[in-house]
Design a protein with these regions (language model features):
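Generic recognition of well-ordered alpha-helical segments
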Residues: 2-5, 120, 158-161, 165
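Extended redox/cofactor-interaction regions of prokaryotic respiratory oxidoreductases
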Residues: 2-114, 122-130, 142, 195-294
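Short, surface-exposed amphipathic charged segments that create phosphate/polyanion-binding patches used
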Residues: 35-36, 117-118, 133-137, 186-188
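Phosphate/diphosphate-binding loops
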Residues: 90, 96-100, 104-109, 144-164, ...
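Short, solvent-exposed loop/turn motifs
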Residues: 118, 221, 310-311
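Catalytic alpha/beta core of large soluble enzyme barrels
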Residues: 119-120, 345
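Glycine/threonine-rich phosphate-binding loop and adjacent beta-strand/alpha-helix elements that clamp
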Residues: 125-148, 163, 349
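Long, contiguous, secondary-structure-rich segments that constitute the structural scaffold
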Residues: 149-200, 267, 272-285, 289-373
């Protein structure tokens, strides 16, 4: 928040490229009401589960606070057994005998290993979709290049068929994927342009907030946010200490971050053998002094652990790691890692105050030589 305030503080928003950009995805005028149809809820508020705490929540019993125990789960576009924090608890939850799990997938992921049913999903080559971006302002159209292979179906078709079997007869459950692509932007994007060219640029100015007009109640860049203060959060962008701060624990003196490995995209592509061969094995980048204190040599198998769990990887002594900080590279699928583990054994289900997201990089650990190399 403090960094985001700097361009307004010095008046840089008036200049082309003078502002700040986290992601361009918020600039897309998606008609979410047309796609999500909140009007059909008729005043009801369905229970929502934060996917970052799925490990705890799958293990929770029924209670007035939590509601009924989770008895069924449909997983799509995700591999939570590999990517969700504190994966030891995630595995315990998915392994419950009384949990009915359906996974929509292309591959036999760690999560698919715990499915009662695996339904084959179409790939991007086989279905309609529209795409936003993190870093540019073109809407992109995805048209199927081939018919669905075998029994594969788009997620949306599975949802339509499930809705029909559950007795939902609203017209929206009969919308085709192409119709939803057309409805996604309404009259904000020329769909004929999309069909012709495959992409359509948004009509956005080079200096969007040169004259103000921020999406805030005041229309200004608000250094103090009354909306956040009303939620019990700090209205000013003050420093918030880490959940697990370096130096706060004698037992776990190292801070661990878990950035993507060079040849994977988080947990995607880990199943591609040629990419695994290039990546080698799960690596932990560690500073030479931290390694020497623990008798760790370059290339030896180490155990990284805290109170939440442990995982195994190979030590990579590197100047990229500063003293006191280690880098657990990549979200390896558990079954493709060392000893059936990955870095998310150690990450926490604690949530941030703003946004209720996971604190993946607030993670204190210890590193030791593994007993068996």
């Amino acid at each position: 928040r403090a960094v985001a305030c700097l361009p307004a503080l010095i008046g840089a928003w008036r200049h082309r490229a003078g502002g700040v950009l986290l992601s361009s995805s918020g600039m897309y005028p998606v008609n979410r009401a047309a796609l999500q149809r909140p009007d059909l809820l008729a005043g009801k508020t369905p229970r929502t589960i934060n996917m970052s705490t799925i490990g705890n929540d799958l293990l929770r019993a029924a209670s007035p606070e939590f509601g009924p125990q989770i008895e069924a789960l449909v997983v799509y576009n995700s591999n939570p057994v590999a990517v969700a924090p504190e994966s030891g608890k995630v595995v315990q939850g998915f392994a419950r005998d009384n949990l009915f799990t359906v996974v929509l997938e292309h591959f036999k992921t760690d999560t698919a290993d715990y499915a009662d049913y695996i339904l084959p999903a179409t790939t991007q080559l086989e279905h309609w979709d529209v795409h936003l971006s993190y870093g540019h302002t073109d809407v992109m159209l995805n048209q199927p290049a081939i018919a669905p292979v075998g029994q594969a179906k788009p997620n949306t078709q599975i949802f339509r068929e499930l809705a029909k079997r559950m007795g939902f007869d609203e017209a929206c459950f009969k919308d085709s994927d192409e119709t939803m692509c057309r409805d996604a932007f309404g009259d904000k994007v020329d769909f004929a342009h999309l069909l012709r060219d495959g992409f359509a640029p948004l009509n956005v100015p080079d200096a969007p907030f040169a004259q103000g007009g921020f999406p805030t109640p005041s229309g200004k860049c608000e250094f103090f946010s009354a909306r956040l203060a009303a939620q019990g959060l700090d209205g000013l962008p003050d420093h918030v200490p880490n959940y697990e701060s370096l130096g706060s624990s004698a037992i776990y003196p190292l801070a661990m971050i878990s950035p993507p490995a060079r040849n994977f995209l988080n947990s995607s592509f880990v199943n591609v053998k040629s990419l695994r061969d290039m990546e080698g094995e799960p690596l932990l980048e560690i500073h030479a002094d931290d390694a020497a204190q623990r008798g760790i040599a370059h290339g030896t198998v180490v155990k990284v652990f805290n109170d939440r769990g442990s995982y195994h990887c190979k030590a990579h002594i590197s100047p990229r790691a500063r003293q006191g900080v280690v880098h657990g590279l990549g979200i390896w699928w558990r079954k493709l890692g060392l000893h059936g583990t990955n870095v998310n054994e150690l990450t926490s289900q604690h949530l941030t105050d703003m946004g209720r997201g996971p604190v993946f990089y607030d993670c204190l650990v210890q590193v030791a030589l593994n007993e068996v190399q």
